[in-house]
Swiss-Prot record:
Belongs to the PCNA family. Homotrimer. The subunits circularize to form a toroid; DNA passes through its center. Replication factor C (RFC) is required to load the toroid on the DNA. Interacts with TIP. Sliding clamp subunit that acts as a moving platform for DNA processing. Responsible for tethering the catalytic subunit of DNA polymerase and other proteins to DNA during high-speed replication. Keywords: DNA replication, DNA-binding. The gene is pcn2. This is DNA polymerase sliding clamp 2. PROSITE patterns: PCNA_1. It comes from Thermococcus kodakarensis (strain ATCC BAA-918 / JCM 12380 / KOD1) (Pyrococcus kodakaraensis (strain KOD1)).
Length: 253
Protein backbone atom coordinates (compact mmCIF):
# COMPACT_ATOMS: atom_id res chain seq x y z
CA UNK A 1 0.00 0.00 0.00
CA UNK A 2 1.71 3.22 -1.16
CA UNK A 3 -0.69 5.38 0.82
CA UNK A 4 -3.73 5.17 3.06
CA UNK A 5 -5.49 8.40 4.00
CA UNK A 6 -8.57 8.77 6.20
CA UNK A 7 -10.80 11.85 6.45
CA UNK A 8 -13.48 11.74 9.11
CA UNK A 9 -16.25 13.37 7.04
CA UNK A 10 -16.92 12.06 3.54
CA UNK A 11 -19.66 14.70 3.13
CA UNK A 12 -17.25 17.54 3.85
CA UNK A 13 -14.76 16.14 1.35
CA UNK A 14 -17.59 15.90 -1.18
CA UNK A 15 -18.21 19.66 -0.88
CA UNK A 16 -14.56 20.33 -1.60
CA UNK A 17 -14.47 18.09 -4.67
CA UNK A 18 -17.80 19.51 -5.89
CA UNK A 19 -16.17 22.94 -6.09
CA UNK A 20 -13.17 21.62 -8.03
CA UNK A 21 -15.46 19.69 -10.38
CA UNK A 22 -17.06 22.96 -11.48
CA UNK A 23 -13.76 23.88 -13.15
CA UNK A 24 -12.09 20.59 -14.09
CA UNK A 25 -13.16 17.24 -15.53
CA UNK A 26 -10.04 15.62 -14.12
CA UNK A 27 -7.25 16.72 -11.81
CA UNK A 28 -3.76 15.79 -10.69
CA UNK A 29 -3.07 15.62 -6.95
CA UNK A 30 0.37 15.54 -5.37
CA UNK A 31 0.41 13.18 -2.39
CA UNK A 32 3.49 13.52 -0.17
CA UNK A 33 4.60 13.45 3.46
CA UNK A 34 3.31 16.99 4.07
CA UNK A 35 -0.18 16.48 2.68
CA UNK A 36 -2.20 16.67 -0.54
CA UNK A 37 -1.78 19.51 -3.03
CA UNK A 38 -3.37 20.41 -6.34
CA UNK A 39 -2.72 23.38 -8.61
CA UNK A 40 -4.34 23.83 -12.01
CA UNK A 41 -5.77 26.35 -14.47
CA UNK A 42 -9.26 25.73 -15.82
CA UNK A 43 -9.72 25.13 -19.58
CA UNK A 44 -11.04 28.67 -20.11
CA UNK A 45 -7.83 30.00 -18.49
CA UNK A 46 -9.87 32.29 -16.26
CA UNK A 47 -9.42 30.55 -12.90
CA UNK A 48 -6.30 29.17 -11.23
CA UNK A 49 -7.01 26.87 -8.29
CA UNK A 50 -4.46 26.13 -5.57
CA UNK A 51 -5.38 23.48 -2.98
CA UNK A 52 -3.32 22.53 0.07
CA UNK A 53 -4.56 19.93 2.57
CA UNK A 54 -1.85 19.31 5.20
CA UNK A 55 -1.53 15.89 6.79
CA UNK A 56 -2.87 17.21 10.13
CA UNK A 57 -6.35 17.49 8.59
CA UNK A 58 -6.65 13.74 8.31
CA UNK A 59 -7.42 11.25 11.07
CA UNK A 60 -4.93 8.87 9.43
CA UNK A 61 -2.22 9.84 6.98
CA UNK A 62 0.16 7.09 5.94
CA UNK A 63 2.25 7.84 2.84
CA UNK A 64 5.29 5.79 1.83
CA UNK A 65 6.61 8.12 -0.86
CA UNK A 66 5.63 11.16 -2.89
CA UNK A 67 3.59 10.54 -6.01
CA UNK A 68 1.17 12.26 -8.36
CA UNK A 69 -2.23 10.73 -8.96
CA UNK A 70 -4.84 11.83 -11.48
CA UNK A 71 -8.44 10.77 -11.85
CA UNK A 72 -11.84 11.75 -13.21
CA UNK A 73 -13.42 14.23 -10.76
CA UNK A 74 -16.94 13.60 -12.00
CA UNK A 75 -16.69 9.88 -11.26
CA UNK A 76 -15.10 10.57 -7.89
CA UNK A 77 -17.86 13.04 -7.02
CA UNK A 78 -20.58 10.52 -7.90
CA UNK A 79 -19.01 8.12 -5.40
CA UNK A 80 -18.80 10.78 -2.68
CA UNK A 81 -22.46 11.72 -3.18
CA UNK A 82 -23.38 8.27 -1.86
CA UNK A 83 -21.90 9.12 1.54
CA UNK A 84 -24.12 9.46 4.58
CA UNK A 85 -23.68 12.25 7.10
CA UNK A 86 -21.49 10.21 9.48
CA UNK A 87 -19.50 8.28 6.89
CA UNK A 88 -15.70 8.30 6.97
CA UNK A 89 -13.72 8.57 3.74
CA UNK A 90 -10.73 6.32 3.08
CA UNK A 91 -8.39 6.82 0.12
CA UNK A 92 -5.72 4.28 -0.60
CA UNK A 93 -3.47 3.13 -3.40
CA UNK A 94 -1.55 -0.08 -3.74
CA UNK A 95 0.47 -1.50 -6.59
CA UNK A 96 -2.38 -1.40 -9.11
CA UNK A 97 -3.22 1.67 -11.15
CA UNK A 98 -6.40 2.33 -9.19
CA UNK A 99 -7.52 4.63 -6.41
CA UNK A 100 -9.52 2.75 -3.80
CA UNK A 101 -12.26 4.86 -2.24
CA UNK A 102 -13.98 3.65 0.90
CA UNK A 103 -17.16 5.03 2.49
CA UNK A 104 -17.23 3.60 5.99
CA UNK A 105 -20.27 3.92 8.22
CA UNK A 106 -23.35 1.77 8.79
CA UNK A 107 -22.12 -0.12 5.75
CA UNK A 108 -18.61 -0.28 4.33
CA UNK A 109 -18.59 0.40 0.59
CA UNK A 110 -15.46 0.27 -1.55
CA UNK A 111 -14.90 1.56 -5.08
CA UNK A 112 -11.95 1.24 -7.43
CA UNK A 113 -11.47 4.25 -9.68
CA UNK A 114 -8.96 4.08 -12.55
CA UNK A 115 -6.03 6.47 -12.41
CA UNK A 116 -5.06 8.37 -15.54
CA UNK A 117 -1.93 10.07 -16.90
CA UNK A 118 -0.63 12.41 -14.20
CA UNK A 119 1.62 14.57 -16.37
CA UNK A 120 0.99 18.25 -15.71
CA UNK A 121 3.03 21.44 -16.26
CA UNK A 122 4.39 23.29 -13.25
CA UNK A 123 2.28 26.37 -12.54
CA UNK A 124 3.63 29.40 -10.69
CA UNK A 125 1.31 31.74 -8.81
CA UNK A 126 2.17 35.30 -9.88
CA UNK A 127 2.93 38.06 -7.40
CA UNK A 128 0.40 40.80 -8.08
CA UNK A 129 0.10 44.45 -6.94
CA UNK A 130 -3.04 43.98 -4.86
CA UNK A 131 -4.11 47.17 -3.10
CA UNK A 132 -7.04 45.76 -1.13
CA UNK A 133 -7.25 42.94 1.37
CA UNK A 134 -10.58 42.16 3.00
CA UNK A 135 -12.01 39.40 5.14
CA UNK A 136 -15.73 38.88 4.58
CA UNK A 137 -18.31 36.33 5.61
CA UNK A 138 -19.22 34.00 2.77
CA UNK A 139 -22.92 34.75 3.28
CA UNK A 140 -22.41 38.47 2.64
CA UNK A 141 -20.37 37.79 -0.49
CA UNK A 142 -22.92 35.26 -1.75
CA UNK A 143 -25.73 37.79 -1.37
CA UNK A 144 -23.73 40.46 -3.20
CA UNK A 145 -23.07 38.06 -6.08
CA UNK A 146 -26.71 36.95 -6.15
CA UNK A 147 -27.87 40.56 -6.34
CA UNK A 148 -25.39 41.32 -9.13
CA UNK A 149 -26.64 38.35 -11.15
CA UNK A 150 -30.06 40.00 -11.40
CA UNK A 151 -28.66 42.77 -13.60
CA UNK A 152 -25.39 41.53 -15.15
CA UNK A 153 -23.00 38.63 -15.64
CA UNK A 154 -20.16 40.77 -14.23
CA UNK A 155 -19.61 42.23 -10.78
CA UNK A 156 -17.28 45.08 -9.86
CA UNK A 157 -15.20 44.88 -6.70
CA UNK A 158 -14.39 48.39 -5.41
CA UNK A 159 -12.92 49.73 -2.19
CA UNK A 160 -12.03 52.85 -0.25
CA UNK A 161 -10.40 52.91 3.19
CA UNK A 162 -13.89 53.02 4.73
CA UNK A 163 -15.95 50.60 2.66
CA UNK A 164 -16.06 47.63 0.33
CA UNK A 165 -18.51 47.89 -2.56
CA UNK A 166 -19.85 45.30 -4.99
CA UNK A 167 -21.58 46.78 -8.03
CA UNK A 168 -23.27 45.49 -11.17
CA UNK A 169 -24.68 47.43 -14.11
CA UNK A 170 -27.20 46.34 -16.71
CA UNK A 171 -28.70 48.13 -19.71
CA UNK A 172 -31.27 49.91 -17.57
CA UNK A 173 -30.49 48.91 -13.99
CA UNK A 174 -27.79 48.93 -11.34
CA UNK A 175 -27.22 47.31 -7.96
CA UNK A 176 -24.72 48.03 -5.19
CA UNK A 177 -23.90 46.11 -2.04
CA UNK A 178 -21.85 48.15 0.42
CA UNK A 179 -20.04 46.80 3.48
CA UNK A 180 -18.33 48.86 6.19
CA UNK A 181 -16.51 47.76 9.31
CA UNK A 182 -19.73 48.41 11.22
CA UNK A 183 -21.45 45.64 9.26
CA UNK A 184 -21.19 42.03 10.51
CA UNK A 185 -20.34 40.76 7.03
CA UNK A 186 -17.03 42.67 6.82
CA UNK A 187 -14.45 41.46 9.34
CA UNK A 188 -11.36 43.32 8.13
CA UNK A 189 -10.44 45.83 5.43
CA UNK A 190 -6.98 47.04 4.38
CA UNK A 191 -6.73 49.54 1.53
CA UNK A 192 -3.72 51.27 0.04
CA UNK A 193 -4.41 54.79 -1.17
CA UNK A 194 -4.68 53.85 -4.84
CA UNK A 195 -7.57 53.15 -7.18
CA UNK A 196 -9.14 49.74 -6.59
CA UNK A 197 -11.79 48.61 -9.05
CA UNK A 198 -12.00 45.36 -11.01
CA UNK A 199 -14.79 43.35 -12.64
CA UNK A 200 -15.14 39.56 -12.45
CA UNK A 201 -17.51 36.96 -13.84
CA UNK A 202 -20.52 36.25 -11.65
CA UNK A 203 -20.75 32.59 -12.69
CA UNK A 204 -17.20 31.82 -11.52
CA UNK A 205 -17.85 33.39 -8.13
CA UNK A 206 -21.10 31.49 -7.77
CA UNK A 207 -19.32 28.18 -8.40
CA UNK A 208 -16.62 28.98 -5.85
CA UNK A 209 -18.94 30.17 -3.09
CA UNK A 210 -21.71 27.59 -3.48
CA UNK A 211 -20.26 25.01 -1.08
CA UNK A 212 -19.37 27.49 1.68
CA UNK A 213 -21.48 28.05 4.78
CA UNK A 214 -22.65 31.63 5.34
CA UNK A 215 -20.47 31.90 8.46
CA UNK A 216 -17.27 30.83 6.68
CA UNK A 217 -14.61 33.51 6.38
CA UNK A 218 -13.31 34.42 2.93
CA UNK A 219 -10.15 36.43 2.25
CA UNK A 220 -10.21 38.55 -0.90
CA UNK A 221 -7.45 40.60 -2.53
CA UNK A 222 -7.84 42.81 -5.58
CA UNK A 223 -6.68 46.05 -7.15
CA UNK A 224 -7.22 47.87 -10.44
CA UNK A 225 -7.98 45.55 -13.36
CA UNK A 226 -5.93 42.67 -11.95
CA UNK A 227 -6.88 39.14 -10.92
CA UNK A 228 -8.91 38.57 -7.77
CA UNK A 229 -7.47 36.29 -5.10
CA UNK A 230 -10.19 34.52 -3.14
CA UNK A 231 -9.13 32.17 -0.36
CA UNK A 232 -10.81 30.19 2.40
CA UNK A 233 -9.60 27.77 5.02
CA UNK A 234 -10.43 24.09 5.48
CA UNK A 235 -10.68 23.40 9.22
CA UNK A 236 -8.25 26.21 10.06
CA UNK A 237 -5.32 24.30 8.52
CA UNK A 238 -6.01 23.60 4.85
CA UNK A 239 -6.33 26.31 2.21
CA UNK A 240 -8.18 26.63 -1.08
CA UNK A 241 -7.23 29.66 -3.19
CA UNK A 242 -8.70 30.89 -6.46
CA UNK A 243 -7.07 33.43 -8.75
CA UNK A 244 -9.74 34.83 -11.09
CA UNK A 245 -8.88 36.86 -14.18
CA UNK A 246 -10.59 40.26 -14.44
CA UNK A 247 -13.00 41.36 -17.09
CA UNK A 248 -11.55 44.52 -18.59
CA UNK A 249 -14.28 46.51 -20.29
CA UNK A 250 -13.84 49.59 -22.45
CA UNK A 251 -15.61 52.82 -21.67
CA UNK A 252 -16.68 51.95 -18.17
CA UNK A 253 -16.88 54.47 -15.34
Amino acid sequence: MTFEIVFDSAREFESLIATLEKFFDEAVFQVNMEGIQMRAIDPSRVVLVDLNLPEMLFSKYSVESEEAIAFDLKRFLKVLKLARSRDTLVLRKGGENFLEVGLLGDENTWFKLPLIDANTPEIEIPSLPWTVKAVVLAGALKRAVKAAKLVSDSIYFMATPEKLTFKAEGNDSEVRTVLTMEDPGLLDLEHKMTKAKSAYGVAYLEDILRSLADADEVIIRFGFDIPLLLKYMVRDAGEVSFLIAPRVEEGRS
